[in-house]
């Protein structure tokens, strides 16, 4: 995989989480209520927002990329299963598949590493497995 491909993948994957996390800051209590409606304790709203924003930023700049990618990938799959698994609702199932696809993309990124255009490359972390 080329370094430009890895950079593009990091940017595209990260933007979703950075924007989504920052958007949740506009109504944290509403987001906490949404989480609670899915059976997830409302007090986890802040850690989820932090994971989305900080994990997204880490992936974007290529810092601790493998860890951040695994965290966001696992989060994507778990959130999809908790909030979007509804076989009676085609849109929710599409959202589930989107989350599963994100999980797959992050798994690939965790395996490939951040590439040369990343903080990890500057600090001597392996760019590829």
Question: What is each of the regions a protein language model found here?
Answer:
Residues 38-39:
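Flexible, solvent-exposed coil segments and beta strand-coil junctions
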Residues 1-26, 33, 42-50, 54, ...:
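Extended, low-polarity transmembrane helix blocks
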């Amino acid at each position: 995989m080329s370094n430009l491909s890895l950079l593009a993948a990091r940017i595209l994957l990260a933007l979703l989480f950075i924007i989504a996390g920052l958007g949740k800051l506009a109504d944290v209590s509403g987001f906490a209520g949404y989480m609670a409606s899915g059976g997830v304790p409302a007090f986890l709203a802040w850690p989820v927002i932090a994971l989305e924003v900080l994990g997204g930023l880490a992936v974007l700049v290529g810092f601790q990329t493998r860890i951040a990618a695994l965290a966001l990938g696992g989060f994507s799959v778990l959130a999809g299963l908790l909030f979007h698994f509804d076989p009676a609702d085609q849109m929710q199932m599409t959202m589930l598949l989107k989350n599963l696809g994100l999980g797959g993309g992050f798994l690939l990124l965790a395996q490939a590493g951040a590439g040369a255009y990343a903080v990890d490359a500057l600090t001597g972390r392996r760019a590829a497995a």
